[in-house]
């Protein structure tokens, strides 16, 4: 899968079409002992080994190729996005190629879920292409924030349709797409991952219905699922102990939380209290809009308005720091 193939494949992609069911074999690197065994094996086994090696070579070649694509500055991003909207093919190609590494980063999060990394990247690239087509630079948000939603949803859609043991009925998939599309639109408008409450308010649907539908987009794996090349370990064996967190990630979380507390001091008291209660800061437990409203004697809608105002103010603070809302809340919302 070359960069040029990625750019031209948009004609084959329609996010609204139902995905075809595809059989896929995930190639894995074999050890020296396995290589010896292959040399004495049947022709079919040797061909399978050669295919695995070629798949790995193709992945490494692709990752090396996209490493030469320079990232765009915020100003360049707006410039090329405007040109792309006017039909400039060169600008469209530059937007895509400059964000291919974002696709790889997101695709790695979905490894070991039934699709090979290269297949995940290919699906994510389709989402990136559609994001370039739909992105509106005049809204003032970075392209990566908007593109992340398209990339994630195309990957998750592929996993949902190609790896589910029980496939969802077509009408359920279409209903789910409505919720996912609304979530993408809200993410561009609000510059953060929308909560079920915000999606429900936008669609005028009960929060419980939104939560249930979004759960259909999650993939559930048994803790006894074998992992690794030899399958000698189960998923349960590598699940992290929440009481013994990785020191590196704990340090990162602490740094983000400390910065967040400092930024909260720049908000007015009401905004600070609402955000603290909503996101579990300053000793509070995370609460819903309704719960926060009951605690501070405000309506759910008023709490939502204060939250939006507070997040908007935080975004302004982050822009001055050269950061974005995703960097602030990835500890709370990262999948």
Curated annotation (Swiss-Prot):
Organism: Vibrio cholerae serotype O1 (strain ATCC 39315 / El Tor Inaba N16961)
Domain of life: Bacteria
The name this protein goes by in its record: RNA polymerase sigma factor RpoS
GO molecular function annotations of the record: DNA binding; sigma factor activity
Family: Belongs to the sigma-70 factor family. RpoS subfamily.
Motif (Interaction with polymerase core subunit RpoC): 119-122
Protein's gene: rpoS
InterPro entries tied to this protein: RNA_pol_sigma-70_dom (IPR014284), RNA_pol_sigma70 (IPR000943), RNA_pol_sigma70_r1_2 (IPR009042), RNA_pol_sigma70_r2 (IPR007627), RNA_pol_sigma70_r3 (IPR007624), RNA_pol_sigma70_r4 (IPR007630), RNA_pol_sigma_r2 (IPR013325), RNA_pol_sigma_r3/r4-like (IPR013324)
Gene Ontology terms: biological process: DNA-templated transcription initiation
GO CC annotation terms, alphabetical: cytoplasm
